[in-house]
Amino acid sequence: MAVRGILGRQRREYRTPEPHPSGARPPKLGDLVPEHVAIVMDGNGRWAKERGLPRTEGHKVGAEQVMDVLQGAIEMGVGNISLYAFSTENWKRSPEEVRFLMNFNRDFIRKSRDTLDELGVRVRWAGRMPRLWKSVAKELQVAQEQTKDNDRLTLYFCMNYGGRAEIADAAQALAEDVRAGKLDPAKVNEKTLAKYLYYPDMPDVDLFLRPSGEQRTSNYLLWQSAYAEMVFQDVLWPDFDRRDLWRACLEFASRDRRFGGAIPNEELLAMEGRSTR
């Protein structure tokens, strides 16, 4: 069954996600579905090494999982997915791997944008322009323009991105407005700075998901992940599919999110009562 979305004043039909080959269906979480899931696609190199293959093969297989995960997110009802495709630190890798990743990401975006558009995915690129290959930036801009009116799922494709870099860029832009007399420094607060981020309307991250067994943020969406629930899985990204995303969403739904607030006194008393029995 196709879903209708809005394109200008007209309505269009979005393509129904293809079911998983196993026949698995997403769990029903109702209001507990995370609105924004940030994913660190980690483990491509280790996956390839375990099989005696070059690192590039891990990246190729890992890319095949992206579309499956996005379709699983649509089935689940997730509104926003952020994918860490290439970080500002990845330039430290060998010239051969950097060249491969630039070419690969450019080709992936070009080949995928029509399918993403049909699925109702809005593509947004987050990252720095300097150093990024012009051919990659062009494909990202074309994908953004083609999908800008889609409203089923927003995909933030983080390319040449770093969390500290984003905050530094925001601070620089804010400082320039202060110097130009457009902004009173005495009135600067968190909300003010947030307006200078790459996408001020990006929802805060609810679920920060990292496969591969590593347990760190790797400088990813630092501002937006202030109160994110962290879920780390041992599966390597090339073996990751929508079922792993669903399992992470189930884990998220079981968490007690207080956003820095205290546990109510009655809950504390109940916990103390249980601990003394």
Curated annotation (Swiss-Prot):
One of its GO terms (biological process) is polyprenol biosynthetic process. One of its GO terms (cellular component) is plasma membrane. Residues 1-30 are annotated as: Disordered. It comes from the Bacteria. GO terms for molecular function: ditrans,polycis-undecaprenyl-diphosphate synthase [(2E,6E)-farnesyl-diphosphate specific] activity; magnesium ion binding; manganese ion binding; Z-farnesyl diphosphate synthase activity. It is an enzyme of class 2 (transferase). Its cofactor is Mg(2+). Binds 2 magnesium ions per subunit. The keyword 4Fe-4S does not apply. Its EC number is 2.5.1.-. Substrate binds at residues 43-47, 55, 59, 87-89, 91, 93, 210, 216-218. Mg(2+) binds at D42, E229. The active site is at D42, N90. Keywords: Magnesium, Metal-binding, Transferase. Homodimer. Belongs to the UPP synthase family. Catalyzes the condensation of isopentenyl diphosphate (IPP) with allylic pyrophosphates generating different type of terpenoids. This is Isoprenyl transferase 1. The lineage of its organism: Bacteria, Bacillati, Actinomycetota, Actinomycetes, Kitasatosporales.
